[in-house]
UniProtKB/Swiss-Prot annotation:
Domain writeup: The CTD-like region mediates membrane-binding and incorporation into large protein complexes.
Species assigned in the record: Mus musculus (Mouse)
Protein name per Swiss-Prot or TrEMBL: Serine/threonine-protein kinase ULK2
Active site: D131
Classification via InterPro entries: Atg1-like, ATG1-like_MIT2, Atg1-like_tMIT, Kinase-like_dom_sf, Prot_kinase_dom, Protein_kinase_ATP_BS, Ser/Thr_kin_STPK_Ulk-1/2, Ser/Thr_kinase_AS
Post-translational modification: Autophosphorylated. In response to nutrient limitation, probably phosphorylated and activated by AMPK, leading to activate autophagy.
Origin organism lineage: Eukaryota, Metazoa, Chordata, Craniata, Vertebrata
Effect of K39T: Decreased kinase activity
Length: 1037
């Protein structure tokens, strides 16, 4: 046990961890029954969170309230600071909602009373919490055991982001969790204490519906959604009481000036409304008649069945979707039990429910009136079904007696009985029981007498939240912001009758399409303009809706007013996702707000068709979205061929060219998700020139590291002709091999000129190439790659082994840049420098993928093996390494995009000529850009759970910058090289010094602070001096 003042804790009793601390469950050393929560903050992190810690301690000491977590003690040890706080044994509201799904209005009122009481004292002291969310609202049971709602005490916790805000002042710091942030906070505008009211509104909405009102894939998407939509209207269920609906609409106002103030919140009628006191259900005499073959235990243990687990629900859903219809639903069928056991059912746990007995034979069913619209499930989930043994009642021979105060409702039910007497019966012959919620307008109830266990046919289909029978709105996950509400035809159906049918028939039978009037389908959903990336996802969701329903097939009118997407698992993950030739996919490519670095491969589209958007602002939005070219074709074709099908200018001629090029070129599969049609070089040659990157050439399609590409033989050329290439000079070094030898071999000629289109990138030194290529075209050998095996270099002046066949004399020619203007050469030099810099940055990402030593040090620190703490720290280390990788990849992508935009602007202005060197460097920049985007997407997918669970890391992540990482890596590289030099290990010292100098030089070009630039420049100069000293010593030796 670890001792902290008068308290102690065990490191195995981990409660949770946040951005700056780990929380353990502890106890008082003398009063062992006094449980506390001990927050341990490592002093290594204290420098970053010291201000937050001081504010939290000060605020907690000042706030003494039963609905605010109490602070008992603060202890400072050599390595840590401990806060001893009140322990809440009920977990947090997020766990409670995870277990319950949704809450009833009465339960919400009980919780909201306590939240308002805590907010009243915060408001009186001028404190804003700034991070109100279900995870920071704790639950405490008074008697240490789970009881009903009245025994739950709400506690507001985690005041790390809280601050004092005096009257008539505004704050502008980004704090909190994005889904619960007020729009003015997430948009980095000035805000006041009303930001907490928005957070309370989102929490209430989640308690009522099961999800926050406005969601998105990322904080950036949510911010864009708030910026686009000036007025927000949350989708409030129709069965919500007017007071609660008014409260939600008042709290969830986008403009803080229109938002409800604290005084109106504290005195709102919903909080002041006195809930109707619930009495025990009155037994209703029923029709007599035996139920054959019924048997059920009467033990109380089987009366209330617990909700099925997730695997069970998945199995149930599969059975329900594949099972045939079981006939028309039997609504509110009453069992043939007696009323003698009514006292057993009047438990306090049934506060929010009306238990309906099996009193009516299976051939009777009726609809509930609209006045008795059922409401959401609350405390417990009760299900009873099957066949129960009837008990003789003394009133069994009499007609049903109306329940007191419900004569009119009972008369209407009796009329419905008569009108629906001819409806079909249950094929299984067993009456069904159901659990129906009371509504505000009609607290009518029937007594469910006896008990029975659920049968498979009676199991309610759920998906993510609990569905009590009678819930007027099925669960479906919240749509992504910006998506288009679809109209369902198989999941929803509307009834024009005045009554709302409540079916809990778990059959998956489809509903005829004509049963869904469009006027009801649009309902009160929030409709917003779709983002371009969501169009493709919605197309996939529309394909799956008819075969993947998420709600019972016989839905009432309450189901049809709020169409929503299906379940989260189907958002954008349809196996049918492919790159097709539909106009919608093409529109996605040509209308995407992301920077289209390279234009269309055809000359009909103007090159450099790049939207004028800032690349840095789109990077995070890009990596969190899925492009339609995500999956590659299964037949092994390169995505670049498929991408041509997406082009608007696609034609049969284009397809035939693709087939020919596919047969000639051995093309590699692109790792990027951007279409190669967008990535083809737009820096085309001069108008009328055939030497353009818009044409298929070996330089454009050869993968890095691959051997040269051989062109097909033209008709009439002998395949066995020997080709000889004469150039002047010495053979090039392997490190400076030509990047292109796209040369058309000619027959024997004495011409000294060059007709090569690739000569500009060849080495200035001449050489003689002798070989027997399969055709008259020589392929290209990229840097570092070996040439074709049939070629060999012969020094100038020596006789070639054979002069038979074709001979070409290739004179050395000057690079194109020699004759260019200085602006051209400076821009090209800058592009090459940024290319080398980003390649060094990409090399750094390989070593940032997680620190395995951290886990080992944690084991030695805690002296325990395989503990929860070590596992969590190890996983946290891996995720943090991925965060650093993501930051570096995003920075590299930003720099590459900026370089490509610079090249585009310079070409348009005529300062940069589209020479071969320019085209090659642009091609390399674009390939690296695609690679960075692909890696960003993969890392974002891996970190989705990390970001969602660690919302408190958002400020810490903002402090992780690529510039700091690059600088630290350069310093470590120089230090390790100097250490190796001291120990005479000089294999790659010069290489590491050069790489560090290159990183610092690139860093000096992107830093903004002049002081930082000056320091980096001094460090780089010292590295260069050391390099010159090494060169001098090497020359001397």
């Amino acid at each position: 046990m670890e001792v902290v003042g008068d308290f102690e804790y065990c490191k195995r009793d981990l409660v949770g961890h946040g951005a700056f601390a780990v929380v353990f469950r502890g106890r008082h050393r003398q009063k062992t029954d006094w449980e506390v929560a001990i927050k341990s903050i490592n002093k290594k992190n204290l420098s970053k969170s010291q201000i937050l810690l001081g504010k939290e301690i000060k605020i907690l000491k000042e706030l003494q309230h039963e609905n605010i977590v109490a602070l008992y003690d603060v202890q400072e040890l050599p390595n840590s600071v401990f806060l001893v706080m009140e322990y809440c044994n009920g977990g947090d509201l997020a766990d409670y909602l995870q277990a319950k799904g949704t809450l009833s209005e009465d339960t919400i009122r009980v919780f909201l009373h306590q939240i308002a009481a805590a907010m009243r004292i915060l408001h009186s002291k001028g404190i804003i919490h700034r991070d109100l969310k279900p995870q920071n609202i704790l639950l405490s049971y008074a008697n240490r055991r789970k009881s009903n709602v009245s025994g739950i005490r709400i506690k507001i916790a985690d005041f790390g982001f809280a601050r004092y805000l005096h009257s008539n002042t505004m704050a502008a710091t980004l704090c909190g969790s994005p889904m619960y942030m007020a729009p003015e906070v997430i948009m980095s505008q000035h805000y006041d204490a009303k930001a907490d009211l928005w957070s309370i509104g989102t929490v209430i909405y989640q308690c009522l519906v099961g999800k926050p009102p406005f969601q998105a894939n990322s904080p950036q998407d949510l911010r864009m959604f708030y910026e686009k939509n000036r007025s927000l209207m949350p989708s409030i269920p129709r069965e919500t009481s007017p007071y609660l609906a008014n409260l939600l609409l008042g709290l969830l106002q986008r403009n803080q000036k229109d938002r409800m103030d604290f005084e109106a919140f504290f005195s709102h009628p919903f909080l002041e409304q006195v809930p109707v006191k619930k009495s025990c259900p009155v037994p209703v005499p029923v029709y007599s008649g035996p139920v054959p073959g019924s048997s059920c235990s009467s033990s109380p243990s089987c009366r209330f069945a617990s909700p099925p687990s997730l695997p069970d629900m998945q199995h149930i859903q599969e059975e329900n979707l594949s099972s045939p219809p079981l006939g028309p639903p039997n609504y509110l069928q009453v069992s043939k039990d007696s009323a003698s056991n009514s006292s057993k059912n009047s438990s306090c746990d049934t506060d929010d429910f009306v238990l309906v007995p099996h009193n009516i034979s299976s051939d009777h069913s009726y609809d509930m009136p609209m006045g008795t619209t059922a409401r959401r499930a609350s405390n417990e989930f009760f299900m009873c079904g099957g066949q129960c043994q009837p008990t003789v009642s003394p009133h069994s021979e009499t007609a049903p007696i109306p329940v007191p105060t419900q004569v009119r409702n009972y008369q209407r039910i009796e009329q419905n009985l008569i009108s629906t007497a001819s409806s079909g019966t249950n094929p299984h012959g067993s009456p069904r029981s159901a659990v129906v919620r009371r509504s505000n307008t009609s607290p009518m109830g029937f007594l469910r007498v006896g008990s029975c266990s659920p049968v498979p046919g009676d199991t309610v289909q759920t998906g993510g939240r609990r569905l009590s029978t009678g819930s007027s709105r099925p669960y479906s996950p919240s749509p992504l912001v910006g998506t288009i509400p679809e109209q369902f035809s198989q999941c929803c159906c509307g009834h024009p009758q005045g009554h709302e049918a409540r079916s809990r028939h778990s059959s998956g039978s489809p509903v005829p399409q004509t049963q869904a009037p469009q006027s009801l389908l649009l309902g009160a959903r929030l409709q917003s303009a779709p983002t371009l990336t969501d169009i493709y996802q919605n197309k996939q969701k529309l394909r799956k809706q008819h075969s993947d329903p998420v709600c019972p097939s016989h839905a009432g009118a309450g189901y049809s007013y709020s169409p929503q997407p299906s379940r989260p698992g189907s958002l954008g993950t349809s196996p049918t996702k492919h790159t097709g030739s539909s106009p919608r996919n093409s529109d996605w490519f040509f209308k995407t707000p992301l920077p289209t670095i390279i234009g269309s491969p055809t000359k009909t589209t103007a090159p450099f068709k790049i939207p004028k958007t800032q690349a840095s602002s789109n990077l995070l939005a890009l990596v969190t979205r899925h492009g339609p070219a995500e999956s590659q074709s299964k037949d092994g074709n390169d995505p670049r061929e498929c991408s041509h099908c997406l082009s608007v200018q696609g034609s049969e001629r284009h397809r035939s060219e693709q087939q020919q090029s596919k047969a000639v070129f051995g093309r590699s599969v692109s790792t990027g998700k951007l279409s190669e049609q967008q990535v083809k070089a737009p820096l085309g040659g001069h108008q009328g020139s055939t030497d353009s990157l818009n044409t298929e050439r070996p330089m454009d399609v050869a993968p890095a590291g691959a051997c040269g590409v051989m062109l097909a033989l033209p008709a009439g050329t002998a395949a066995s002709a020997r080709a000889v290439l004469f150039t002047v000079g010495s053979p090039p070094h392997s490190a400076t091999a030509p990047t292109c030898t796209h040369m058309v071999l000619r027959t024997r000629t004495t011409s000294v000129g060059s007709s090569s289109s690739g000569g500009s990138l060849c080495s200035a030194s001449g050489r003689v190439c002798v070989g027997s290529p399969p055709g008259p075209g020589l392929g290209s050998s990229p840097p570092g790659a070996e040439g074709a095996p049939s070629l060999r270099y012969v020094p100038y002046g020596a006789s070639p082994p054979s002069l038979e066949g074709l001979i070409t004399f290739e004179a050395p020619e000057l690079p194109e840049e020699t004759l260019m203007e200085r602006e051209h050469t400076d821009t090209l030099r800058h592009l090459n420098m940024m290319l080398m810099f980003t390649e060094c940055v990409l090399d750094l990402t390989a070593v940032r993928g997680g620190n395995p030593e951290l886990c080992t040090s944690a084991v030695s620190l805690y002296q325990i093996q395989e503990s929860v703490v070590v596992d969590q720290i190890s996983q946290l280390s891996k995720d943090w390494g991925r965060v650093e990788q993501l930051v570096l990849y995003m920075k590299a992508a930003q720099l590459l995009a900026a370089s490509l935009h610079l090249a585009k602007a310079q070409v348009k202005s005529g300062k940069l000529s589209p020479s071969m060197a320019v085209k090659q460097v642009v091609k390399n920049l674009n390939e690296r850009y695609k690679f960075c985007i692909t890696m960003c997407k993969k890392l974002t997918e891996k970190l989705n759970r990390f970001f969602s669970d660690k919302q408190r890391f958002i400020d810490e992540i903002n402090s992780v910058t690529a510039e700091k990482l690059i600088y630290n890596c350069a310093v470590e590289m120089v230090q390790s090289a100097a250490l190796d030099e001291m120990f005479q290990q000089t294999e790659d010292i010069v290489y590491r010094y050069h790489k560090a100098a290159l990183l610092l030089e690139g860093l000096s070009k992107i830093l903004q602070d002049p002081t930082d630039v000056e320091n980096v420049h001094k460090y780089k100069c010292s590295i260069e001096r050391r390099l010159s000293a090494l060169c001098c010593s090497t020359a001397t030796v």
